[in-house]
Curated annotation (Swiss-Prot):
Mg(2+) 2 binds at E27, D295, D297, T298. This is ADP-ribosylhydrolase ARH3. It catalyses: [(1''->2')-ADP-alpha-D-ribose](n) + H2O = [(1''->2')-ADP-alpha-D-ribose](n-1) + ADP-D-ribose; 1''-O-acetyl-ADP-alpha-D-ribose + H2O = ADP-D-ribose + acetate + H(+); O-(ADP-D-ribosyl)-L-seryl-[protein] + H2O = ADP-D-ribose + L-seryl-[protein]; alpha-NAD(+) + H2O = ADP-D-ribose + nicotinamide + H(+). SUPFAM superfamilies: ADP-ribosylglycohydrolase. PANTHER family: ADP-RIBOSYLGLYCOHYDROLASE (PTHR16222), ADP-RIBOSYLHYDROLASE ARH3 (PTHR16222:SF24). It is found in: Nucleus; Cytoplasm; Chromosome; Mitochondrion matrix. It is an enzyme of class 3 (hydrolase). It comes from Xenopus tropicalis (Western clawed frog). Binds 2 magnesium ions per subunit. GO terms for molecular function: ADP-ribosylserine hydrolase activity; hydrolase activity, hydrolyzing O-glycosyl compounds; magnesium ion binding; O-acetyl-ADP-ribose deacetylase activity; poly(ADP-ribose) glycohydrolase activity. Its cofactor is Mg(2+).
Amino acid sequence: MMAAGVSRFRGSLLGALLGDCIGAVFEGHTNVTKEFLFDYMKSLDKGERLKRVLTYTDDTAMARSIVQSVLENYEFNIEDLANRFTTEYNRDPDRGYGMAVVHVFEKLGSGEYKHVFSPAREQFDGKGSYGNGAAMRVVGISLAYPRIPDIIEYARTSGMLTHASSLGYNGAILQALAVHYALQGELAPETFLDQLLDHMKEVETDKKSRSDALELEMDEFPYCNKLRKIKAFLAREDVTRKDIVKELGNGIQAFESVPTAIYSFLRCLKPVSELPSELTNLQRTIAFCILLGGDTDTIATMAAAIAGAYHGEEQIPLNWKLSAEGYKDAEDWGEKLHQLYCRRLQSTTS
């Protein structure tokens, strides 16, 4: 396996950043009109937003912590990551963190817990969170580790810091795998989905994954079922936004947002009739996610992380990039992650 070019690494981090920043403007809107969205995007094109920088949310704040941790610790270090999450929250708490994860950070910072996973396991009467917080921040794992077993292990482990339910951390695994395969370049959507399905079948066969799904009165293998639904949707020309929200979701649960992000990326590989033809694939992906409503910042950040890894930074207009808080860090870290990825790849093949 050859390493992808640095443009894909920078593109993935910049895409994730822009998906979060732009998606946050529309989060929670029940009916985002195309006219309003397109006018907003035109203002970005013209540079009208440069005077007032678009700020990122907790999605990017935690993604930044993962990136910094994997860059500064050659071996994955869960204690370091836990400390970074807590320190970053205490430094800048007004990023839109949910109360559940705030309680985890408060407990981690108290010094009263011997194991870093214990606070997350106490959440929701011991069931743990199955939200999308673990998935929204995981992009750095995919960009630091070329081997599938490492991606799965570290996506799971990093997720378990805040999401003890397998439905939460399995969503992080799926998102991390999607970014990984997007990094590899040209790939037929069906092949892309088949590869994800092969891995998620194995991930979802463990006892906890099956019991967690049944406890929520879901079918076994919820992520595999969603991936099959994506396949079916891609084979149709008449899929509406209402269909997507009903079958894939647009909520804060991981299983109602990670599959939606993957579908949005794949759907936007081709022109979408209701979106302006002049948009790049990556811009189209962000716009498509926003029009679905709901948890727009998180779905857009995940979808754009995948799209950026696939298409590269060339698809990001300069004024879009310049409008986002932290874009220089994303560029710099993308280059450093590319170097780290290449070193690891070389060590596995030598």
